[in-house]
Structures are given as structure tokens and as C-alpha cells.
């Protein structure tokens, strides 16, 4: 179509051409009809949106996404307003697949409870299939009984230090995580040996390499789940105190990652994911999230008198003010300064 008319073809028009002209005249592509029509339609509309973003200068030229390298394997939606996507406590009905049992029961709101499932996706990670659904829920009323604000300072020694006195340890230093990291190194070495053996013409089978890859992927997935769960628990516990606002620092994570001695530790802390999840939770509960500029000297400023200690080193874990004699943990002092900071942006 583009070669003949030299114009951009919208998604809806391309879908009509594909179904009414191209596939009937090209029998070798009839396999497209074997999957759900909504999945094909969604792929076309995704490409339509990607090209429109490119033409508007919002993003770069779209790249072809190979199916085997994508986590999302299937997309399904409601066909019209009168139909529903059936879901029960222990199973969900997926187009072309039928009823599929769910391992974790009771996580998805069911249609019997009055909820409406608008769409869903089936994805695969580390050899396991996951289904996620978009559910229409009634607006929840947020409580307005707010207390005072709090400041949160993120770090490497401890993950988060809160101005109310709470300190959340670095989970990557626990024996549980270290044990998984040790096992991950061992499995990665085994995978490397199999690759080297295959290059040298050894007897290693590709099926065995695939099995070893799954072992490594499962360990990575488990590590990611442990860290994400820890972040969710910290945010939930913080939001339950019902602060009127939460203040955090706009960390330059990309710049911090350039330090080769700290890059691994910084990446494992997942600072950006913490900010994104906190932002969503604050919006859900009507809490104001304040973002302080990264150049604000929260650690070097005395919370008692306001003087700035410019010679404070990263190795100095205790803040001692030469002006007024105030002494406190440097991270706790920073969280207090973030709480009282008056120059900020609202996320």
C-alpha cells in the first residue's frame, strides 16, 4: 500500500487491507487467522502508535521486535461492551486457549464478584507463564486524616532512612540474598563452560544449554522478586502512616552508575523503581510527593543551625556541626533536611 500510494497507512485501514485483500490472495499467510483476531489487531495498533510517535518527533524510528525476545506472548481484549472475559477464582478463559488454570488462586478479581476485565496479556519469564489483566474498579475513597510530612534519604549502607526514625536495611547484605548470588555465580560459570565446549566442537547439546539458561534466568527472576517485594513493603509501611507529603531526592542514578566501584551496588538497590512505585502509591492515596533537586546539600547541611559542612566526606558516617555542635547520623540528618526543604518539584 505504501509503495503504491506513498503515504502513511493508519492502523484501521491496514487491518482492513490485511484481512480483505492480502490474506485471501496469499494462502501461505493464513496462519495469521489461527490466533485471536484481537491479538493481531492490537499488534497493528501498537505499530500505528509507534509510527505516529516517530512522525511527531516523540520517539525514534520503530524497530522490529522479534517475538522470541519479547516477554509478552499474547494480548486479548473484550470484543464488545456486551461480552465479558470469564474469570473464576482458580481459572481464566483466554481466547483460542479456553479455560486455563491459575497457580495462585484469588489474586484476580472475578466476574462473579461484579468486576469487569477489560483486557489481558500472557507473558513468559524464566520459563514460567504469567497472565495480567486490566480490571475496571470503582473509585476508592481516600482518607484525609493526614499527619505531618516525612523525608526519605536513600543510600547504599542502608536502603532508606526516614525522618520519623525508621531505618530500612540494605536487603542485598542479608544472608538470603548473598546465598542466591553465590548460587547464581556458580550457575553462570557452568553456562559459560557449556558455551566454550560447544565452540570447541565438544559434545555439549543445545538442549542442555537451554536448560542451564533457564536455571540462570530463574535465579535472576527470584532476585528481582525479592528486591521488588522489599520495596513494596517499605512503601506500604510508609504510606500507612498517612503523611501529608513525602520528600525524596532526585538522584542522578545514571551518573552514579559511572562509578565502576559502586555501579553493581547501585543497580541492585533499584532506586528508580522505588521512586516510580512510591509515586503511584502516593497518587492512589492522595499524598503529595515532593522531589528535591539533586544538587541540594541535604547531607552537608546542619539540620539544627543550617550551616553547610562543605568538607564532609563519603566515608564520614556521622555528621558533626562545627558551628553549633549538633551530632547525628549523616543519613538521618539528610532525611530531616529533605523533610523541611522548601524548594522542590511535585511529581
For each of these PLM feature ranges, what is it?
Residues 2, 51-58, 158, 191, ...:
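A generic secondary-structure signal for well-formed alpha-helical elements
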Amino acid at each position: 500500500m505504501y509503495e503504491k500510494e506513498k503515504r502513511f497507512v493508519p492502523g484501521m485501514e491496514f487491518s482492513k487491507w490485511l484481512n480483505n485483500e492480502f490474506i485471501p490472495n496469499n494462502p501461505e499467510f493464513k496462519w495469521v487467522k489461527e490466533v485471536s483476531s484481537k491479538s493481531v489487531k492490537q499488534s497493528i495498533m501498537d505499530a500505528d502508535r509507534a509510527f505516529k510517535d516517530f512522525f511527531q518527533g516523540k520517539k525514534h524510528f520503530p524497530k522490529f521486535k522479534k517475538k522470541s525476545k519479547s516477554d509478552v506472548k499474547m494480548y486479548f481484549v473484550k470484543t464488545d461492551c456486551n461480552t465479558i472475559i470469564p474469570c473464576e477464582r482458580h481459572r481464566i478463559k483466554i481466547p483460542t486457549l479456553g479455560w486455563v488454570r491459575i497457580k495462585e488462586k484469588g489474586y484476580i478479581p472475578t466476574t462473579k464478584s461484579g468486576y469487569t476485565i477489560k483486557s489481558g496479556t500472557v507473558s513468559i519469564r524464566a520459563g514460567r507463564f504469567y497472565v495480567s489483566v486490566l480490571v475496571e474498579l470503582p473509585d476508592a475513597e481516600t482518607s484525609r486524616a493526614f499527619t505531618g510530612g516525612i523525608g526519605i534519604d536513600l543510600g547504599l549502607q542502608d536502603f532508606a532512612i526516614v525522618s520519623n526514625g525508621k531505618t530500612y536495611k540494605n536487603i542485598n547484605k542479608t544472608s538470603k540474598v548473598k546465598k542466591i548470588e553465590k548460587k547464581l555465580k556458580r550457575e553462570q560459570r557452568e553456562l559459560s563452560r557449556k558455551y566454550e565446549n560447544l565452540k570447541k566442537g565438544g559434545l555439549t547439546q543445545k538442549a542442555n544449554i537451554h536448560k542451564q539458561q533457564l536455571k540462570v534466568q530463574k535465579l535472576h527472576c527470584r532476585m528481582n522478586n525479592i528486591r521488588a517485594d522489599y520495596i513494596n513493603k517499605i512503601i506500604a509501611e510508609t504510606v500507612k502512616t498517612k503523611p501529608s507529603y513525602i520528600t525524596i531526592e532526585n538522584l542522578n542514578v545514571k551518573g552514579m552508575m559511572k562509578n565502576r566501584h559502586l555501579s553493581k551496588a547501585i543497580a541492585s538497590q533499584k532506586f528508580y523503581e522505588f521512586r516510580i512505585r512510591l509515586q503511584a502509591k502516593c497518587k492512589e492515596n492522595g499524598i503529595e510527593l515532593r522531589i528535591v533537586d539533586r544538587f541540594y546539600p541535604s547531607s552537608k547541611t546542619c539540620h539544627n543551625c543550617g550551616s553547610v559542612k562543605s568538607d564532609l566526606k563519603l566515608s564520614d558516617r556521622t555528621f558533626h556541626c562545627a558551628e553549633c555542635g549538633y551530632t547525628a547520623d549523616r543519613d538521618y540528618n539528610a532525611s530531616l533536611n529533605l523533610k523541611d526543604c522548601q524548594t522542590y518539584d511535585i511529581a
